[in-house]
Design a protein with these regions (language model features):
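Exported/periplasmic ABC-transporter solute-binding proteins
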Residues: 2-42, 49-53, 61-70, 75, ...
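Phosphate-/polyanion-interacting regions in eukaryotic proteins
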Residues: 58
């Protein structure tokens, strides 16, 4: 089983789900983490292009759609699982800036010495849509860092960025950081996460059963504890 989000989002949920599921079914789940997009060798599209052994992907729905269009994922296997939202974090021990209003959020961005965001959908949204819409693209570009191949939280924890932006589900279990909160509702972007079965899966029936389980109420608690909102 592949999971898409770097860091901890679906890995955390699956680590909660896997033991009971394995005991009940006798099916062993092997978890691997990988970015859902990007140029790194670890990114799911690049791993699938190398025909690595994969049965299921759990990833951003938009990225899953591309894999379906490329015939890498079975079209009718796609199931929506959880919603995620963008949060901001600072290094543990640092002052928590105010982002409760758009005015405060804007001031925090301008006052920050540095900020980091991922090279996945949340980071692309911030860099190419939100910051230009706020007329801050020029001011923020010089002090922004795009993170590839690891959690934005890890970069913040090392002190390499003052502010870090990523999905709440990706940030909430990273050590050494404190989550300030979600960015304001008026500029928030929901990311939908879905599951799909790989076209060359060696275990299609077992994969279908697991995807069905993840979309059932049995998995709701694990999904919520991972910072996601269940769809079903």
């Amino acid at each position: 089983l592949f999971r898409s989000a770097r860091g901890v989002s679906w890995l955390a949920a699956m680590q909660l789900v896997a033991p009971a599921y394995e005991e009940a079914t006798g099916v062993h789940i092997r978890l691997q983490e990988a970015p859902s997009m990007g140029r790194s060798p670890e990114a799911i599209p690049n791993r699938l292009a190398r025909r690595e052994s994969v049965d299921i992907v759990l990833m951003e729905d938009a990225a899953l759609s591309r894999l379906i269009n490329q015939s890498e994922v079975q079209k009718h296997s796609r199931v929506e699982l959880g919603k995620s939202f963008i949060a901001m974090a600072v290094r543990q021990g640092a002052v928590k800036p105010d982002i409760g209003t758009m005015k405060a959020f804007r001031s925090t961005l301008l006052d920050a010495q540095s900020l980091a965001y991922s090279d996945s959908s949340s980071g692309l949204y911030l860099a190419h849509l939100l910051f230009p819409r706020m007329k801050l693209a020029v001011q923020l570009k010089a002090k922004s860092k795009t993170v590839t191949g690891e959690s934005v939280g890890a970069v913040v924890a090392r002190g390499e960025a003052q502010l870090g932006f990523q999905q709440l589900s990706e940030l909430m279990r990273v050590p050494g950081i404190v989550i300030v909160g979600l960015i304001p509702d008026s500029v928030q972007k929901m990311t939908l996460y879905s599951a799909g079965i790989i076209s060359h899966s060696a275990h299609p029936s077992e994969s279908a059963a697991l995807v069905k389980y993840l979309a059932s109420p049995h998995a709701h608690d694990a999904i919520e504890r991972s910072g996601l909102i269940p769809v079903h």
